[in-house]
């Protein structure tokens, strides 16, 4: 298995949150979102984890003094974030997993499955199915099912790509470092956001004949990002239900489970009794 490191993208401001606090420090069940992502990736990569910070970087660094950071002084997109991290990654790994820091439902099992499923690919990305794709990047496939590209929602033109698909980019990638080093300089920012998208690596890799794999994860909510207070609230409820279900299955007595709010990082022994 190729030596792999993880890169967590945590530089964005999160404008739609309408808060001065960095988006990854918004809390879910009392813990900042970034903590859940770190907890999911650290066991898989034996500490080979970097966090890209930008907006209010000092606040994020202070909240996680045990993490290693790369600075993205200008927030020019996900592709630009990977560019800034390349000097720190080169010589340390053969491929890199890139994941968004605003996915508080992410689990170690999902990360491990994705890394193992993408082992034979030059570049892989996770996809999920959504009834309403909203602002997610659309996965464009050829007639034979092979991946053609990921097109950001605001740039999607049905005249060019066909009817909008329900399969969307889940924001988790695994790419060979030598391929990233070769293709990143060719990414442009001629799009409506004026940003450098990491998703552009996919169409470039396809054009080069590289093995590009879209790892389908069904409707798994664990990969859903948080971009607004509404999505934050929904993620918290998903996580609360997951915690409650786990406690009940482990032998914890909950008398009013609908009222229980416990951090998934808390330890509750079997036989404990919680009244709400």
Could you tell me what each predicted segment is?
Residues 65, 106-192, 199:
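Conserved core of the sugar-phosphate nucleotidyltransferase
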Residues 193-276:
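Left-handed beta-helix
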Residues 27, 105, 174, 225-226:
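Short aromatic/basic micro-patch
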Residues 1-5, 31-116:
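Conserved N-terminal catalytic core of the sugar/cofactor nucleotidyltransferase
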Residues 24, 48, 68, 146, ...:
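Conserved beta-strand segments of alpha/beta enzyme cores
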Residues 1-19:
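N-terminal nucleotide-binding beta1-loop-alpha1 segment
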Residues 12, 102, 129:
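Active-site glycine-centered loops adjacent to acidic/histidine catalytic or metal-binding residues
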Residues 21-27, 69-71, 187-190:
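Short glycine-enriched, charge-decorated loop/helix-capping segments at active-site entrances
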């Amino acid at each position: 298995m190729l030596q792999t490191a993880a890169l967590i993208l945590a530089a964005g401001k999160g404008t739609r949150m309408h808060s001065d606090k960095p988006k990854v420090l918004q809390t879910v069940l009392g813990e900042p979102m970034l903590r859940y992502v770190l907890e999911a990736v650290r066991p898989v990569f034996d500490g080979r984890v970097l966090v890209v910070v930008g907006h209010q970087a000092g606040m994020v660094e202070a909240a996680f003094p045990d993490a290693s950071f790369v600075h993205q002084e200008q927030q020019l997109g996900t592709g630009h974030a990977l560019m800034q991290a390349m000097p720190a990654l080169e010589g340390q790994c053969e491929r890199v997993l890139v994941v968004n820091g605003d996915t508080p439902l992410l689990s170690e099992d999902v990360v491990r499955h994705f890394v193992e499923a993408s082992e034979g690919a030059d570049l892989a990305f996770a996809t999920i199915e959504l009834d309403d794709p909203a602002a997610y990047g659309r996965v464009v496939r050829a007639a034979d099912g092979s991946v053609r590209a990921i097109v950001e929602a605001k740039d999607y033109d049905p005249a060019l790509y066909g009817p909008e698909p329900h399969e969307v980019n889940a924001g988790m990638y695994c790419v060979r470092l030598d391929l990233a080093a070769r293709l990143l300089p060719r990414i442009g920012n001629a799009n409506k956001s004026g940003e450098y998208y990491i998703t552009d690596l996919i169409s470039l890799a396809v054009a080069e004949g590289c093995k590009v794999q879209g790892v389908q994860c069904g409707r798994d909510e664990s990969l859903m990002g948080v971009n607004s207070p509404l999505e934050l609230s929904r993620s918290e409820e998903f996580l609360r239900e997951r915690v409650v279900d786990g406690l009940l299955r482990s032998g914890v007595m909950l008398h009013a489970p609908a009222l229980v709010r416990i951090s998934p990082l808390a330890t509750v022994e079997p036989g404990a009794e919680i009244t709400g």
